[in-house]
Structures are given as C-alpha cells and as structure tokens.
Design a protein with these regions (language model features):
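Loop-to-transmembrane alpha-helix initiation sites
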Residues: 138, 154-162, 176-187
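Interfacial segments of multi-pass membrane proteins
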Residues: 54-59, 80-84, 121-151, 163-173
Length: 217
C-alpha cells in the first residue's frame, strides 16, 4: 500500500511539474505584441520580455506583460504545491515551491512554444520568489528600483537584483539549511548569464537607457 501511495505522490508531483513548465512557457510578451500586429522578436532588443514590449509596443502593455510574467512564477510556486498536496491526499516535501517555481522560470527562459527561445526570467523569478523568500525578494526589488531610477539601465538594475537576492538569501536563510540560498544563487547566476548580450552592449556603450516616459516623436 505504501508503494502505491509513493507512486501516486510521484505522479502528482510530476504532473504539476509539467504544468508549471508549460504555464511558465506561455510567451505573454510575444502574444501581447502579436495582438497588436508586431513580432516582438524582430523589433527592439528582440527579447520577448516586458522591457522590450514596454519600449517597442507601449508602456501599458509592457506593464501588463510584467504582471502576467510575474504570475507565471507566483502561481506554480504558491498555488501548485497546495493543489498537489490536495490531489495526493498527503503532505508533500517542503521543497516543492522551489521545484515548481524553478520549472516555471525554466519555461519562461526556454519556452517549448517558441523553439526554446524565451525571456531572461526576471519577472517570473520575482513572482516565484515573493512567496518563497519574501524578505530577500523585497531587498532585491529595492536594489532594482534604486538602481533603475539612479542610472536608468534596466539590465544593470536586473543584474544588481540578481546579486542582491542571493546575498540576502545567504544572510537571512542559511541557518535553516543551504537549499534555499543555493537555489537563489543558481537563479541569480542564470539571470546574469541571460543578460550577457546586455553586458556586451554596456561595455561598448550601445545599451539603451530606460525611459519612464516614452519620448514624443
């Protein structure tokens, strides 16, 4: 009987893991821009994320993209573990939010719907982490905002946040084990790596600054 129960738990976790990836893989920026007749992959930076939608389509749709991409991380990390436990009719491992949130981020970064060419994972990561590591995420958001307002480079602000969140994680959570700090470190490294093109543009002086108000033609 215990073997059957373990099998059911494994199947439930696997099923919700697949759903987390598929939800994360929904290319909100691509779909929103497509509805306006724009292929977001062929304008601006070519990225499907919120910043490129903000710059290349409209401010409002860029903000909408950010909100939807954040939800792609929050729903698997916060809601899926509860539903998985309900389906399995037993308590499940405490690391499930990390697993489901990580799979959603992987889906956004490597979406099956767009031949595995996705975004940089900043908004989806923020959504996933707000419930998993709220204090560290809050520190990261503060660092991101101050950097963005100060120097107006979205890429630099995202990289600063990608460093700040793991650093805060080691400070705040290491007493409870290394799993969460290590996961935050891996996620931060992924986000920085996904910004390698931005880093090259920063080095050669061609990176665009973020404009809070779109310039009038």
């Amino acid at each position: 009987m215990n073997g059957v129960c373990n099998c059911n738990v494994t199947l439930v976790i696997a099923a919700f893991g697949v759903l987390a990836y598929l939800l994360g893989a929904i290319p909100n920026g691509f779909l929103i821009a497509k509805a306006k007749g724009i292929d977001i992959r062929k304008v601006g930076s070519g990225n499907i994320g919120a910043t490129n939608v903000y710059r290349s389509v409209s401010k409002a749709l860029g903000i909408l993209t950010f909100a939807l991409d954040s939800l792609k991380g929050a729903i698997p990390a916060l809601w899926f573990p509860v539903q998985a436990a309900h389906c399995a009719q037993t308590s499940l491992p405490a690391w499930l939010p990390l697993l489901f949130g990580g799979l959603a981020i992987a889906g956004h970064t490597w979406p099956v719907y767009l031949k595995f060419k996705g975004g940089k994972g900043v908004a989806t990561s923020a959504g996933a982490l707000i419930g998993i590591a709220p204090a560290a995420t809050g520190i990261g958001v503060l660092c991101w905002f101050v950097t963005l307002v100060t120097i107006r480079y979205m890429s630099v602000a995202s990289i600063v946040a990608a460093v700040a969140v793991p650093a805060a994680g080691w400070w705040l959570y290491r007493a409870n084990g290394l799993a969460l700090p290590l996961a935050l470190t891996a996620l931060g490294a992924l986000i920085i790596w996904r910004h390698k093109g931005n880093i090259q543009r920063l080095m050669n002086g061609s990176e665009s600054r973020f404009e809070f108000k779109k310039k009038k033609p």
